[in-house]
């Protein structure tokens, strides 16, 4: 059974919830995803479960898997450069707090280019523009990183 919970966005949860992805993306009219994950989730096939669904639907994406535990400023900057180079128009984050927080930081800098890096965002609220549209696919419980606009 798929359930729906609304907070900052819409949360689908329950068995088969990932199958909602293609319909959601198509309804929004997005063309290409920037899929932010970590190397272990790629290595163990977790990210592939998502990209297999996307492949079956002919959805374009690029995987960025250089996210480290407790990501650094440089890690976020690398992600910003990769997002820009990808030509993506939305983001999918897969993982725990590190992937979610890195994705949120990347997205806010992409849509607010007046900020050079995450340090320049400290204490700034609200930003001029919202973050890049992001679909969060958590693989852990407890951080709530997928449900908040903040990143640490």
Give the ranges of each region predicted by the language model:
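ATP/NTP phosphate-donor binding region
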Residues: 1-90
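Glycine/threonine-rich beta-strand-loop-alpha-helix active-site module
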Residues: 74-152
